[in-house]
């Protein structure tokens, strides 16, 4: 009976060791350390006292913000500096990923005036990403020179590769052209010979005289020429519509072009509509030209009246400004400054003045005056 209880207790302790860890069961064993019999525990060498340390993988972080990559912060490689950046610190441009620093310098086109406007921090970061030492740089100009020097070396390598590719493409195109020209020339002669045979067969089969045939062919060619001219005109109009910058810009009509009401009668319907449209006048219900002329006449008269009233208002405003106090620009000039005698302020401002604002003479007294 005691042996069965001992084996059952040992199996229970093994399960607790697997589930809770060896340390939890060892805490309970300390209470039974002095016990004897089936309650005495023996250490199991298969289980360690402390849990195994987790193996840490390489921690790859963004070069700009220093945050680790995740599902929401994906890793991208900059096409210029070949460093790892997250999606927030990189810019997608023309299917190429660049970091913010490389993109900023790429926007300047590596021109010295544009580079001098950048911050020193951005220039230093650009050089550090390319593992270029900047210990000898003391001024901003040194950083700019270093950037231009490095960019010049990179552009020369690009030019060498591009020139090599272009030379290869030129040689391949030369051989392909020479190869195909040897086979296209006999085929062209054969096609021309077959065309002459077909023309001879058609003329022999048809019993129409040669003069009639020549007249028919000339008429057909004239019709074809007319159709071609019309098609060319349509194509030119479409090209002008698609590329307005290539054609001469037509000057639109406006109210300033009218010197009197008599000029309105000589304008076309298109010009009248342009004038109304530029002045936000609706002409959707107008079906005849005289209706458009009436609207333009009314618009011209209203414009003349507005200009006259605006001129009168400006004149009155100038007169009012001449009579306002030069200090507060609110009250009317009603004060004489003594001893100089200038009238440039109101009574309230004149009493506060210590010297005249015009002649800088000391103000002895400010006298209030009345205008009749």
Swiss-Prot record:
Lineage here is: Eukaryota, Metazoa, Chordata, Craniata, Vertebrata
Q: Which domain of life is it from?
A: Eukaryota
Q: Which Gene3D superfamilies match?
A: 1.10.720.140, SAP domain (1.10.720.30), Zinc/RING finger domain, C3HC4 (zinc finger) (3.30.40.10)
**According to the UniProt entry, which residue ranges have a biased composition of type Acidic residues?**
221-239
* GO CC terms of this entry: cytoplasm; cytosol; endomembrane system; nuclear body; nuclear speck; nucleoplasm; nucleus; plasma membrane
Tissue-wise expression: Ubiquitous. Detected in heart, brain, liver, skeletal muscle, kidney, pancreas, spleen, thymus, prostate, testis, ovary, colon and leukocytes.
Annotated GO molecular function terms are: p53 binding; phosphatidylinositol phosphate binding; ubiquitin protein ligase activity; ubiquitin protein ligase binding; zinc ion binding
EC assignment: the record states: 2.3.2.27
Put simply, this protein is called E3 ubiquitin-protein ligase RNF34
């Amino acid at each position: 009976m005691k042996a069965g209880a001992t084996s059952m207790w040992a199996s229970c302790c093994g399960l607790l060791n697997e589930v809770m860890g060896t340390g939890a069961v060892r805490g309970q064993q300390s209470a039974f350390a002095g016990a004897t019999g089936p309650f005495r525990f023996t250490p199991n060498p298969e289980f360690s006292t402390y849990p195994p340390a987790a193996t840490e993988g390489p921690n790859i972080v963004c070069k700009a913000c220093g945050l680790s990559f995740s599902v929401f912060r994906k890793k991208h490689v900059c096409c210029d500096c070949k460093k790892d950046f997250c999606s927030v610190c990189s810019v997608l441009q023309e299917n190429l990923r660049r970091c913010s620093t490389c993109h900023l310098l790429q926007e300047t086109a590596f021109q010295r005036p544009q580079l001098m406007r950048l911050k020193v921090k951005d220039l230093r970061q650009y050089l550090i990403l390319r593992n270029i030492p900047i210990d000898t740089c003391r001024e901003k100009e040194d950083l700019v020179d270093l950037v231009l020097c490095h960019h010049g070396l990179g552009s020369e390598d690009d030019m060498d590769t591009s020139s090599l590719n272009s030379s290869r493409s030129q040689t391949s195109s030369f051989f392909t052209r020479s190869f195909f020209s040897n086979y296209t020339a006999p085929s062209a002669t054969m096609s021309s010979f077959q065309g002459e045979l077909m023309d001879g067969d058609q003329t022999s089969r048809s019993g129409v005289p040669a003069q009639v045939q020549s007249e028919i062919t000339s008429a057909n060619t004239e019709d074809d020429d007319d159709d071609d001219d019309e098609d060319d005109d349509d194509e030119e109009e479409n090209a002008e519509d698609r590329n307005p910058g290539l054609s001469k810009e037509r000057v639109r009509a406006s109210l300033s072009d009218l010197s009197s009401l008599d000029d309105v009668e000589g304008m076309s319907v298109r010009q009248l509509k342009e004038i109304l449209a530029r002045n936000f006048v609706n002409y959707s219900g107008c079906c005849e030209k005289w209706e458009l002329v009436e609207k333009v006449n009314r618009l011209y008269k209203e414009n003349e009246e507005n200009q006259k009233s605006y001129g009168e208002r400006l004149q009155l405003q100038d007169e009012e400004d001449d009579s306002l106090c030069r200090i507060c620009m609110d009250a009317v000039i009603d004060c004489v400054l003594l001893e100089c005698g200038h009238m440039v302020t109101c009574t309230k401002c004149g009493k506060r003045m210590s010297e005249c604002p015009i002649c800088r003479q000391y103000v002895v007294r400010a006298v209030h005056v009345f205008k009749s």
